[in-house]
């Protein structure tokens, strides 16, 4: 009986610690968003003396927004940069889009690379290798095909690349688009994701996504170049780790990495979340414990039980009040990341928020159930530590 009492006391203490940690994350991310995001960065050096940048753009297939997204990179207001467009397959329709833009912007230093170079199991690395090998500038900007930018995006990122910084990354967010699936994505990338992403970076944990990353090429070369990361599916995590292990700091751009894919749906979003969770579980096994208890409904139940055990408060009343507070703070976070008026109503937000939170346990259990992922054109079996092997159809 004494052992049971001790276990309950321990669980109650855990609940209160969880409460403090999660609400610190809320406050840190909201304050950081208000102070840092969507602010014009201070110019660290004269415009004419900004260093050259090689943009590596991996492309696969075409969606309705691809040409408009790509065109924003040809219209950057930056003195010295090159655009290296990378397409793996010779019959990919993205090639025609690239050729159209190359013809429209002859004064932009841009080239098209077709065919890639097989150096490992990561298709993105394979696609980028020929461009990486001929990149002529000291700064490498790897940016996904679904990202769109504004003219001063690159200037902002380079201004963050100060003397001791080795990597500049953008907080992933989603552009305003039509439909409930777009709202669902926007709610996730404006609430749950930045809360974890920002608080991790503020407290010194290296949390980086590869959607938009500016890196020092010489530091990557010291780590073995891109080829050293071809054995991983989550190459962005291991590239960031290699840079951090060499003593370099990270900085976050004041502009978000604006995702603007023209192809989106609830099922695509769900599949993406499951894939990301699988990768996190294999790279960081502690995710198995930390991730479920950091979500609203599970956390509210644990903390509610702790409050009931210690103060005899009604669990369900506490659960509802805690979820309501979480819901409100998430809305504040979302408005901060958006940096302006949302394109959907508060009712749309409420529905999308509830559905997203309700999906979390299913997503987590689905990720645990099957260790394989489908990405781009292949299927892969994940191994502990982040490596993977390709599953070949016989």
From Swiss-Prot:
GO cellular component terms, semicolon-separated? Golgi membrane
Question: Which stretches are Cytoplasmic in the membrane topology?
Answer: 33-195, 305-309, 370-394
Is Lipid biosynthesis one of the keywords UniProt gives this record? yes
Give the residue interval(s) assigned to the motif D3.
236
Q: What EC designation does it have?
A: 2.4.1.80
* Pathway membership: Lipid metabolism; sphingolipid metabolism
Q: Which residues lie on this side of the membrane: Lumenal?
A: 1-10, 216-287, 329-348
Q: Could you tell me which Pfam families the record lists for this protein?
A: Glyco_transf_21 (PF13506)
Q: Knockout: what is the outcome?
A: Embryonic lethal. Homozygous knockout embryos initiate gastrulation with clear differentiation into embryonic germ layers, mesoderm, endoderm and ectoderm as well as the regional expression of critical genes. However, a major apoptotic process leads to their resorption that starts at 7.5 dpc and is completed at 9.5 dpc. Neural cell-specific conditional knockout does not affect early brain development but mice die between postnatal days 11 and 24. Dysfunction of cerebellum and peripheral nerves associated with some structural defects are observed.
Which residues get modified to N6-acetyllysine? 117
**Active site, UniProt feature:** 236 (proton acceptor)
Point out the annotated site residues (description: May play an important role in binding to the inhibitors DEPC and PDMP).
193
Q: Tell me what reaction this enzyme catalyses.
A: an N-acylsphing-4-enine + UDP-alpha-D-glucose = a beta-D-glucosyl-(1<->1')-N-acylsphing-4-enine + UDP + H(+); UDP-alpha-D-xylose + an N-acylsphing-4-enine = a beta-D-xylosyl-(1<->1')-N-acylsphing-4-enine + UDP + H(+); N-(9Z-octadecenoyl)-sphing-4-enine + UDP-alpha-D-xylose = beta-D-xylosyl-(1<->1')-N-(9Z-octadecenoyl)-sphing-4-enine + UDP + H(+)
Q: Where is this motif: D1?
A: 92
Give the top-level enzyme category. Answer: transferase
What residue intervals traverse the membrane? Answer: 11-32, 196-215, 288-304, 310-328, 349-369
Instruction: Share an example GO biological-process annotation for this protein.
Output: neuron development
The annotated topology with respect to the bilayer is: Multi-pass membrane protein
Keyword line: Acetylation, Glycosyltransferase, Golgi apparatus, Lipid biosynthesis, Lipid metabolism, Membrane, Sphingolipid metabolism, Transferase, Transmembrane, Transmembrane helix
Q: What is its main location?
A: Golgi
Function per UniProt: Participates in the initial step of the glucosylceramide-based glycosphingolipid/GSL synthetic pathway at the cytosolic surface of the Golgi. Catalyzes the transfer of glucose from UDP-glucose to ceramide to produce glucosylceramide/GlcCer (such as beta-D-glucosyl-(1<->1')-N-acylsphing-4-enine). Glucosylceramide is the core component of glycosphingolipids/GSLs, amphipathic molecules consisting of a ceramide lipid moiety embedded in the outer leaflet of the membrane, linked to one of hundreds of different externally oriented oligosaccharide structures.
User: Could you give the domain comment from the record?
Assistant: The D1, D2, D3, (Q/R)XXRW motif is a critical part of the GCS active site, involved in catalysis and UDP-sugar binding.
What is the protein named? Ceramide glucosyltransferase
């Amino acid at each position: 009986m004494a052992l049971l009492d001790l276990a309950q006391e321990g669980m109650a203490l855990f609940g209160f610690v969880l409460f403090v940690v999660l609400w610190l994350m809320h406050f840190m991310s909201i304050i950081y968003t208000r102070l840092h995001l969507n602010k014009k960065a201070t110019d660290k050096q004269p415009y004419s003396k900004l260093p050259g940048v090689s943009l590596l753009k991996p492309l696969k297939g075409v969606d309705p927004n691809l040409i408009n997204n790509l065109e924003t990179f040809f219209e950057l207001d930056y003195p010295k940069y090159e655009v290296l467009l990378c397409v793996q397959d010779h019959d990919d329709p993205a090639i025609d889009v690239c050729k159209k833009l190359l013809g429209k912007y002859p004064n932009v230093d841009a080239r098209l690379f077709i065919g890639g170079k097989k150096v490992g199991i990561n298709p993105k690395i394979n696609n980028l290798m020929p461009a990486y090998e001929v990149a002529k500038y000291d700064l490498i900007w790897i940016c996904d095909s679904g990202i769109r930018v504004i003219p001063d995006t690159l200037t902002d990122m380079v201004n963050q690349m100060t003397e001791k910084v080795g990597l500049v990354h953008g907080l992933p967010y989603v552009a305003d688009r039509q439909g409930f699936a777009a709202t669902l994505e926007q709610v996730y990338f404006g609430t749950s994701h930045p809360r974890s992403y920002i608080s991790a970076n503020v407290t010194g944990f290296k949390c980086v996504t590869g959607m938009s990353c500016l890196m020092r090429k010489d530091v990557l070369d010291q780590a073995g170049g891109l080829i050293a990361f071809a054995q991983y599916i989550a190459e962005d995590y291991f590239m960031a780790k290699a840079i951090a292990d060499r003593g370099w700091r990270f900085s976050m751009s004041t502009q978000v990495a604006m995702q603007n894919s023209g192809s989106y749906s609830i099922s695509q979003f769900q599949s993406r979340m499951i894939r990301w969770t699988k990768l996190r579980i294999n790279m960081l096994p502690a995710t198995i414990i930390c991730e479920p208890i950091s979500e609203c409904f599970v956390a509210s139940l644990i903390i509610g039980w702790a409050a009931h055990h210690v103060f005899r408060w009604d669990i369900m009343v506490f659960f509802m009040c805690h979820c309501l507070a979480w819901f409100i703070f998430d809305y504040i976070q979302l408005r901060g990341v958006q940096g302006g008026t949302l394109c959907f109503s508060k009712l749309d937000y409420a529905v999308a928020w509830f559905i997203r939170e309700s999906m979390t346990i299913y997503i987590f259990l689905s990720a645990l159930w099957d260790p394989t992922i489908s990405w781009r054109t292949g299927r892969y079996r994940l191994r502990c530590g982040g490596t993977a092997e390709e599953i070949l159809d016989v």
